[in-house]
């Protein structure tokens, strides 16, 4: 390692906050972020002596004049607040370099992806981006007497800070090339237009009067216009009353709600799930169950996950944007506002905008957004609820144009985005609860975490429904899920009495034990040859979608299901035929209009698709199946049962034999 004597153009000053017991206030420091430095360092004058320890292994550093110096003091796991969020510095070395605290490349990598612009940087914490503004005038506070002056009841005057903005500092660097200053300036220039446009369309207020065109409107209608929905108010704890007071004031300031004289009323309550605990704030929810029963639905269907994933086939680079409280950007007409009236400790209010909780809500924003876009945007952009995904397949230049087009369209329409949630020019991106990574995809880690947080002993049917719901969400990634679910699914029958025993708990434990991770599945490209492999047993059917790419086969999806009671009486050959049909239906969005290959270990299937059935009464079912299959273009390849990878895989991974 060596020292250099000029500021890395890839580094900036940001405000960091340290807090120690016994000190009268937070220690506000100007931290230097330097991707060229391999270490995090701090002055002994900004961290109390008791937090420093002697390093087990002193670090030898070679400086510019060839002299070796030793870093002997280290501070471990130091919390620091940046951009309002709590980060942890794993290891911090003591070194007097003329700045209070330096965040090196190891810190940037820990909270990657690390993105920097001319006026701010982005770290990522718990899969959320944290925006931290750049300080243009930096000071060194850590001088002799600073810590003493900050102690509670201290009579020591606080030393004057030193302006270090223009100073030339010496920083530790690891062997290798640095980011060239000219290259850095080119990168900043390249994104400046997108930065400026994103700034123009972003706001913390979803109906910002300076940016929103407020043209998006919606109507909610009662099935029977004479119906009055009244659900009695709930009781609230003192802490909930305080939280309601804060949130109602915020909503009134945003002008998304107003006091109501409506004859309708639905109760509001607070929820605190994992997401709410992470952000440290409960979420207000209105129980519109009764109102949803009394109102007409919306005919617009949301695209399913497979439809959206099909759109990004072959794409290599992505950007995503979160519409700021997307539903709140859609205004309600006066009659519809009355239907949204809710009660809370502060009184009776109604929404000026579409609230969360209405059954029509999920489709309102994407329908309105989609109707405002021409088909040209659908080639590289899709919308799901209030998330916008932009995707390109030829490189950054094309993607730059696509992103700029969408941002300009948002500005024209007055659609407000959340700046802090924007993800730009990513080869890997989180969307729809999935991690999409250049041709592969798998559920995000929190899906697996939710599964493992369920106790082995389930309390009631509702809790079991939630558990099975998460498994179903991840069904594309779990072979033979139908047979795994079956022992638990039977407990949800309406006429069954709830029971749970030790054997059930053991089964739950084994399910979680076997779900250690989700596989990364291949996302087929348009020119790939597609293959399905199927199998059937007495009660279940299953299949795999594969793709042949550059002479290699990749697994794309799993599918499985149960035969109905009547179907379980079919002959085994018929079950094999039905399994093929079910698997084709499951993967039809990929198989139409492609020519694909069906692999099966059932010899009768090849015979079945080639014979001409007479269509008499006894063969009616087979005739219907044959006619249905005729709409698809496929070849058939028979494989021996011993070579049916899918069947073998199912046998090896089934959980039903564990209990």
Swiss-Prot record:
Its EC number is 3.4.23.-, 2.7.7.49. PROSITE patterns: RT_POL. GO terms for biological process: proteolysis. Residues 1-180 are annotated as: Protease. One of its GO terms (molecular function) is aspartic-type endopeptidase activity. The active site is at residue 34. Residues 252-436 form the Reverse transcriptase domain. This is Enzymatic polyprotein. It comes from Carnation etched ring virus.
